[in-house]
Protein backbone atom coordinates (compact mmCIF):
# COMPACT_ATOMS: atom_id res chain seq x y z
CA UNK A 1 0.00 0.00 0.00
CA UNK A 2 0.86 3.64 -0.11
CA UNK A 3 1.64 4.67 3.48
CA UNK A 4 1.52 8.40 2.72
CA UNK A 5 -2.14 8.30 1.76
CA UNK A 6 -3.31 5.50 4.04
CA UNK A 7 -6.77 6.46 5.29
CA UNK A 8 -7.15 9.38 2.90
CA UNK A 9 -9.25 9.52 -0.22
CA UNK A 10 -7.16 10.41 -3.24
CA UNK A 11 -8.88 12.76 -5.64
CA UNK A 12 -9.91 11.12 -8.86
CA UNK A 13 -7.67 12.81 -11.42
CA UNK A 14 -6.35 11.58 -14.71
CA UNK A 15 -2.73 11.11 -13.73
CA UNK A 16 -1.95 9.66 -17.18
CA UNK A 17 0.33 7.06 -15.69
CA UNK A 18 2.35 9.49 -13.56
CA UNK A 19 3.78 7.93 -10.41
CA UNK A 20 2.18 9.16 -7.17
CA UNK A 21 5.58 10.45 -6.05
CA UNK A 22 5.62 12.89 -8.97
CA UNK A 23 2.24 14.28 -7.87
CA UNK A 24 3.41 14.52 -4.24
CA UNK A 25 6.45 16.59 -5.28
CA UNK A 26 4.31 18.71 -7.64
CA UNK A 27 1.75 19.45 -4.91
CA UNK A 28 4.49 20.08 -2.32
CA UNK A 29 5.98 22.66 -4.67
CA UNK A 30 2.62 24.45 -4.75
CA UNK A 31 2.57 24.47 -0.94
CA UNK A 32 6.14 25.79 -0.73
CA UNK A 33 5.51 28.57 -3.23
CA UNK A 34 2.29 29.55 -1.46
CA UNK A 35 4.02 30.01 1.89
CA UNK A 36 6.88 31.90 0.21
CA UNK A 37 4.37 34.34 -1.29
CA UNK A 38 2.91 34.96 2.16
CA UNK A 39 6.36 35.50 3.68
CA UNK A 40 6.82 38.57 1.51
CA UNK A 41 4.05 40.33 3.43
CA UNK A 42 6.01 40.28 6.68
CA UNK A 43 9.59 40.05 5.41
CA UNK A 44 12.24 41.51 7.74
CA UNK A 45 9.69 42.12 10.49
CA UNK A 46 9.70 38.76 12.26
CA UNK A 47 12.45 36.28 13.08
CA UNK A 48 13.29 33.58 10.56
CA UNK A 49 12.45 30.84 13.08
CA UNK A 50 9.01 32.41 13.57
CA UNK A 51 8.54 32.43 9.80
CA UNK A 52 9.31 28.70 9.63
CA UNK A 53 6.88 27.93 12.45
CA UNK A 54 4.19 30.03 10.76
CA UNK A 55 4.77 28.27 7.42
CA UNK A 56 4.52 24.80 8.96
CA UNK A 57 1.36 25.54 10.95
CA UNK A 58 -0.33 27.50 8.14
CA UNK A 59 0.40 24.73 5.60
CA UNK A 60 -1.38 22.15 7.75
CA UNK A 61 -4.18 24.23 9.29
CA UNK A 62 -5.13 26.43 6.30
CA UNK A 63 -3.52 25.31 3.03
CA UNK A 64 -4.19 21.56 3.24
CA UNK A 65 -7.93 21.91 4.00
CA UNK A 66 -8.40 24.45 1.20
CA UNK A 67 -6.59 22.10 -1.20
CA UNK A 68 -8.97 19.33 -0.23
CA UNK A 69 -12.04 21.56 -0.52
CA UNK A 70 -11.09 22.65 -4.05
CA UNK A 71 -8.97 19.85 -5.56
CA UNK A 72 -9.78 16.77 -3.49
CA UNK A 73 -13.51 16.36 -3.89
CA UNK A 74 -14.41 18.58 -0.94
CA UNK A 75 -17.31 20.99 -0.50
CA UNK A 76 -16.11 23.59 -3.04
CA UNK A 77 -15.32 20.92 -5.61
CA UNK A 78 -18.81 19.44 -5.16
CA UNK A 79 -20.34 22.88 -5.77
CA UNK A 80 -18.60 23.03 -9.15
CA UNK A 81 -15.69 25.32 -8.26
CA UNK A 82 -12.90 24.80 -10.78
CA UNK A 83 -9.28 25.71 -10.06
CA UNK A 84 -6.97 24.47 -12.78
CA UNK A 85 -3.59 25.72 -11.54
CA UNK A 86 -4.06 27.37 -8.17
CA UNK A 87 -6.04 30.57 -8.60
CA UNK A 88 -8.09 29.82 -5.50
CA UNK A 89 -5.87 27.44 -3.59
CA UNK A 90 -2.70 29.48 -4.06
CA UNK A 91 -3.50 33.09 -4.91
CA UNK A 92 -6.71 33.85 -3.03
CA UNK A 93 -5.57 31.77 -0.08
CA UNK A 94 -2.13 33.35 0.28
CA UNK A 95 -3.41 36.81 -0.61
CA UNK A 96 -5.80 36.76 2.33
CA UNK A 97 -3.16 35.24 4.62
CA UNK A 98 -0.59 37.81 3.51
CA UNK A 99 -3.00 40.69 4.12
CA UNK A 100 -3.86 39.42 7.59
CA UNK A 101 -0.18 38.83 8.41
CA UNK A 102 0.78 42.33 7.24
CA UNK A 103 -1.97 43.88 9.35
CA UNK A 104 -0.99 41.84 12.43
CA UNK A 105 2.75 42.55 12.09
CA UNK A 106 2.28 46.22 11.21
CA UNK A 107 4.27 48.69 9.15
CA UNK A 108 7.98 48.47 8.53
CA UNK A 109 10.11 50.87 10.51
CA UNK A 110 11.17 53.27 7.76
CA UNK A 111 14.13 54.73 9.67
CA UNK A 112 16.02 51.42 9.95
CA UNK A 113 16.84 50.83 6.28
CA UNK A 114 17.68 53.02 3.36
CA UNK A 115 16.36 51.18 0.34
CA UNK A 116 18.47 51.24 -2.80
CA UNK A 117 16.76 52.12 -6.08
CA UNK A 118 15.28 49.25 -8.06
CA UNK A 119 17.61 47.43 -10.41
CA UNK A 120 16.07 46.85 -13.85
CA UNK A 121 18.30 43.84 -14.60
CA UNK A 122 17.22 42.10 -11.37
CA UNK A 123 13.60 42.92 -12.16
CA UNK A 124 13.87 41.31 -15.59
CA UNK A 125 15.76 38.26 -14.27
CA UNK A 126 13.19 37.77 -11.49
CA UNK A 127 10.25 38.16 -13.85
CA UNK A 128 11.84 35.70 -16.30
CA UNK A 129 12.35 33.08 -13.58
CA UNK A 130 8.76 33.54 -12.46
CA UNK A 131 7.56 33.27 -16.06
CA UNK A 132 9.39 29.99 -16.67
CA UNK A 133 8.16 28.62 -13.33
CA UNK A 134 4.56 29.38 -14.19
CA UNK A 135 4.88 27.36 -17.38
CA UNK A 136 5.65 24.37 -15.16
CA UNK A 137 2.81 25.03 -12.74
CA UNK A 138 0.18 25.86 -15.33
CA UNK A 139 1.02 23.20 -17.91
CA UNK A 140 1.86 20.64 -15.21
CA UNK A 141 -1.63 20.99 -13.80
CA UNK A 142 -2.89 19.14 -16.89
CA UNK A 143 -1.05 16.00 -15.66
CA UNK A 144 0.28 15.13 -19.09
CA UNK A 145 1.32 16.34 -22.51
CA UNK A 146 -2.17 17.01 -23.82
CA UNK A 147 -4.43 19.73 -25.20
CA UNK A 148 -5.06 21.20 -21.73
CA UNK A 149 -1.32 21.56 -21.13
CA UNK A 150 -0.87 23.22 -24.52
CA UNK A 151 -3.70 25.67 -23.84
CA UNK A 152 -2.27 26.44 -20.39
CA UNK A 153 1.11 27.22 -21.95
CA UNK A 154 -0.48 29.40 -24.63
CA UNK A 155 -2.55 31.38 -22.13
CA UNK A 156 0.51 31.79 -19.87
CA UNK A 157 2.50 33.14 -22.82
CA UNK A 158 -0.26 35.55 -23.87
CA UNK A 159 -0.74 36.80 -20.30
CA UNK A 160 3.01 37.37 -19.95
CA UNK A 161 3.14 39.29 -23.22
CA UNK A 162 0.16 41.44 -22.19
CA UNK A 163 1.74 42.16 -18.80
CA UNK A 164 5.07 43.09 -20.41
CA UNK A 165 3.33 45.44 -22.84
CA UNK A 166 1.34 47.07 -20.03
CA UNK A 167 4.52 47.54 -18.00
CA UNK A 168 6.30 49.16 -20.97
CA UNK A 169 3.37 51.53 -21.52
CA UNK A 170 3.27 52.56 -17.87
CA UNK A 171 7.03 52.99 -17.52
Q: What are the roles of these predicted feature ranges?
A:
Residues 1-171:
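Hydrophobic alpha-helical transmembrane bundles of multi-pass membrane proteins
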Amino acid sequence: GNFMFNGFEIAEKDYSGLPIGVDVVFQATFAIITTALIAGSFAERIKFSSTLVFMAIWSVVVYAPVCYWVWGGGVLSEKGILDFAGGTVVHINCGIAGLVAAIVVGKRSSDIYTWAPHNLIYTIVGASLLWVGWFGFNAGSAYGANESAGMAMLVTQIATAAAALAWMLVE
